[in-house]
Regions:
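Bacterial lipoprotein signal-peptidase II cleavage site
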Residues: 28-42
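Conserved C-terminal helix/tail region of periplasmic/extracytoplasmic solute-binding proteins
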Residues: 305-324
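Solvent-exposed, polar/charged alpha-helical surfaces in well-ordered, non-transmembrane soluble domains
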Residues: 56-60, 64-65, 87, 91, ...
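Short, glycine-/small- and polar/acidic-enriched structural segments
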Residues: 39-168, 179, 195-199, 214-218, ...
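Short, solvent-exposed loop/beta-turn-alpha elements that line the ligand-binding surface or hinge
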Residues: 69, 220-224, 288-297, 317
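Sec-dependent bacterial lipoprotein signal peptides
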Residues: 1-29
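Pocket-lining segment of extracytoplasmic ligand-binding domains
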Residues: 102, 178, 183-268
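Secondary-structure end/capping motifs
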Residues: 239-310
Length: 324
């Protein structure tokens, strides 16, 4: 078991998900996976994860030997987020990656063979749209015509904002979403480069400490039941390594059970793989974890994506789920 330094610069701007996927479709046809074995169990597996509080279960499973106990030789790699991790998955750099479901659906809709093998986190109070304390914005409809910082242009954050604005009677098409890494959004907000920002723990707690305020929770009302992110692999890897997939999913579920509601564990663990202090972790809103894939939630996400133009037409997500 090991953790490998970050492969992608989380502070640099990245191209939109669709552009990255288009490049993958052209460049990686026929590529294999990193650790697959034809006998149904991978000799070793590479896992790409974004370093957040939300990915504590996968790190915990590695650090405590849960993966090893399940027969998996795991190597963890940090990524710059799901939209950037998916091309690396298809290119064979990883066997499993953590991604938001919007990026996963976009990939599948454009023909990439990605499948969801496990859930991870569900929308809760750990996500929020935030503004400065002296902001003139006071309700969701006020974002009409505003500039909002998000960590990826085609992501669950922009999708949820669009759904909430529509529910409030505003036009989400008039929101200007700007792509920025989470750690620099606060400075951009203070400098007036953006009017509001999407923050997720532990950055939400840090923003509150800096004096910023929650304009509205991101997952409420029309977005209250949305799953946020989970774990995907390629169809080839899932078909060729069913034992590895089952072991990964079962181990993640065990780890979620151990991590869930154990703040002391998180206070000790999260600072080891993020730049977040134990003091901040002690104050964060706890994520809501669920390792089970959510077919209905994924379908609802795809329906919203079609409504707001993230995909061109209705998309059946049934074949995206690889679960018992």
């Amino acid at each position: 078991m090991s953790r490998v330094p970050e492969r992608a610069d989380g502070r640099s701007r990245v191209t939109a998900t669709t552009a990255a996927i288009a490049a993958v479709l052209l460049a990686t046809a026929g590529c294999g996976t990193a650790g697959g074995a034809a006998d149904g169990a991978a000799d070793s597996v590479g896992i790409g994860y974004f370093p957040l509080v939300h990915t504590a279960p996968v790190v915990h499973a590695d650090e405590t030997g849960l993966f090893a106990d399940a027969g998996l030789d795991v190597e963890l790699h940090t990524t710059a987020g799901g939209a950037q991790a998916i091309p690396s998955l298809i290119a064979g750099e990883y066997d499993f990656v953590y991604t938001n479901y919007v990026s996963a659906v976009i990939a599948a809709e454009q023909g990439l063979p990605v499948v969801v093998v496990a859930g991870n986190d569900v929308g809760a109070d750990d996500h929020a749209i935030m503004v400065t304390a002296d902001s003139p914005l006071s309700e969701p409809a006020d974002l009409e015509g505003a500039t909002v910082g998000v960590n990826s242009l085609q992501n669950v954050g922009s999708l949820a904002v669009s759904a909430i604005l529509e529910d409030a009677g505003a036009d989400p098409g008039l929101v200007d979403f700007v792509e920025l890494p989470y750690p620099v959004m606060g400075a951009a907000l203070e400098q007036g480069e953006i009017d509001a920002m999407w923050q997720v723990e532990p950055f939400t707690t840090g923003a509150l400490a800096d004096g910023h305020e929650v304009l509205f929770p991101l997952f409420d009302g029309p977005t209250g039941d949305l799953p946020v992110a989970g774990w995907i692999t390629t169809r080839d890897f899932a078909d060729e390594n069913p034992e590895a997939v089952d072991a990964f999913r079962d181990t993640l579920s065990t780890s979620v059970d151990q991590v869930r509601d154990d703040r002391d564990l998180l206070v000790d663990l999260v600072p080891t793989y993020t730049e977040v202090s134990a003091e901040v972790v002690a104050e964060v809103a706890m994520p809501v974890w669920d390792a089970a894939p959510d077919p209905e939630g994924l379908a609802a996400t795809a329906d919203l994506m079609e409504r707001f133009g993230l995909i061109g037409e209705a998309f059946d997500t049934t074949e995206m789920i690889d679960a018992p």
